[in-house]
UniProtKB/Swiss-Prot annotation:
GO terms for molecular function: carbohydrate binding. InterPro entries: F-box-like_dom_sf, PP2-like. Residues 1-43 form the F-box domain. This is F-box protein PP2-B15. CDD domains: F-box_AtSKIP3-like. The lineage of its organism: Eukaryota, Viridiplantae, Streptophyta, Embryophyta, Tracheophyta. PANTHER family: F-BOX DOMAIN-CONTAINING PROTEIN, F-BOX PROTEIN PP2-B15. It comes from the Eukaryota.
Length: 289
């Protein structure tokens, strides 16, 4: 005996988007129930109406909640095109990308240090490229209340190294994450991948500075470097953090940063697209299948 469609819809609303999508193969009742607005509204962020109102096309009409869900999976521009909002297809977890204009970048308003211009490879209307500086400081902020509750998040600086880059692989930068009044978590990373030939040339010019920074020497096997993304950009993990239950006064400010201010090392030739904050994959415990 088949359950009524309304009962099936109620059951599906307590599962996940992935379960609902796969259940469509069970029967026509599951397929119809799984397409209902009742089910998909449960999977949408609780503040989805507010998110849509902040989009660059706030008056767009969606034929169903499932269509809206799919749209958010593809991502939308919000806050005058300065942020990207997205949800994961199988889990409904929230992600954000803060554009370079939404970040605090020291001296980014000085044209002899940084250059702002439209980029065909950017998600946003413009990006910024470092011309030259010895004081690199990039800071982004987001509230935990804007993210999915009880979720482990990672923050990633989206960047590219240009063909004329210099001074990026001699002195490590610091990455950090700080949530509310909690302890700041600091790690070190290089801004470009190791290039032995280029390093030998730069040592001629920056040898003394390199000696002053000898205490920051990183064993090659443990050297953190940018990693290639599927979209052609590269990313540096700034750190990770957990969101709380989202109830009461659980909303906290997350400060994410990348800095290189200790080596007085001239550097240039990196393009910044923004900082992505996205859920990290669940870790599989040793010994589990």
């Amino acid at each position: 005996m088949m359950l009524p469609e309304a009962c099936v819809a109620t059951i599906l609303s307590f599962t996940t988007p992935a379960d609902t999508i796969s259940s469509a193969a069970v029967s026509s009742v599951f397929r119809v129930a799984g397409d209902s607005d009742f089910v998909w509204e449960k999977f949408l962020p609780t503040d989805y109406c507010h998110v849509i109102s902040r989009s660059t096309d706030p008056h767009r009409i969606f034929s169903s909640k499932k269509e809206l869900y799919r749209c958010l999976c593809e991502s939308i521009l919000i806050d005058n095109g300065r942020k990207i909002f997205k949800i994961e297809k199988l889990s409904g977890k929230i992600s954000y990308i803060l554009s370079s204009r939404d970040l605090s970048i020291t001296w980014s308003d000085q044209r002899h240090y940084w250059s702002w211009s439209p980029r065909s490879d950017s998600r946003f209307s413009e990006g910024v490229q470092l011309i030259m500086t010895d004081w690199l400081e990039i800071i982004g902020k987001i509230q935990t209340g804007a993210l999915s509750p009880n979720t482990n998040y990672g923050a990633y600086l989206i960047m590219k190294v240009t063909s004329r880059a210099y001074g990026l692989d001699l002195v490590p930068a610091e990455t950090s994450i700080k949530v509310g009044n909690g302890e700041k978590k600091i790690k070190s990373t290089y801004l470009s991948c190791l290039d032995n030939k280029k390093q030998q040339m730069e040592r001629v010019f920056y040898g003394q500075r390199e000696q002053r920074m000898a205490t920051h020497e990183v064993v090659r096997s443990h050297r953190r470097e940018p990693e290639v993304r599927d979209d052609g950009w590269m990313e540096i993990e700034l750190g990770e953090f957990e969101t709380g239950s989202g109830e009461g006064d659980d909303d906290k400010e997350v400060v994410m940063s990348l800095t290189e201010v200790k080596g007085y090392q001239l550097k240039g030739g990196i393009a910044i697209d923004g900082i992505e904050v996205r859920p990290k994959p669940l870790k599989v415990r040793a010994g589990t299948n």
